[in-house]
């Protein structure tokens, strides 16, 4: 099986990258693993033009297609993301918004292969354990 582990943080050598490396190293014993970092790709924001609803293609020419090719390659996709103000980083959100041409569940044009498994790992760090515990418990 092929596994894609995606660092969804704009910080390429932080805590998220550390988790990506640990997960990737563990999985390499059994699987064909690739790791990518969202910060290595040029991702424009969705313009909300809805052109993709009719054509199944985005009018923007950036690196989103390169990430989708990695998704197509993989049987399992693991997204590892920090929490920024209780949400995902803007870069990851921009990517998700731009996935509409490939995986809009209401669109007959959706082209992402079915049968893939997806997992997510969310990180929360803070200046103290007390702060992290408060977020985890709520």
Each PLM stretch: what is its role?
Residues 91, 107-138:
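Short, glycine-/small-residue-rich phosphate/pyrophosphate-handling segment
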């Amino acid at each position: 099986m092929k596994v894609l582990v995606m660092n969804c943080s704009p910080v390429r050598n932080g805590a998220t990258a550390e988790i990506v490396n640990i997960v990737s190293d563990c999985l390499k014993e059994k699987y064909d693993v690739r790791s990518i970092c969202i910060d290595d790709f040029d991702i424009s924001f969705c313009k909300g033009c809805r052109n993709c609803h009719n054509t199944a293609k985005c009018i923007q020419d950036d690196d989103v297609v390169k990430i989708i090719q990695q998704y197509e390659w993989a049987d399992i996709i693991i997204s590892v993301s920090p929490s920024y103000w209780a949400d995902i980083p803007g870069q990851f959100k921009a990517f998700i918004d731009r996935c509409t041409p490939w995986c809009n569940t209401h669109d007959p044009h959706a082209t992402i292969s079915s049968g893939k498994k997806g997992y997510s790992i969310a990180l929360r760090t803070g200046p103290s354990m007390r702060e992290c515990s408060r977020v985890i418990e709520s």
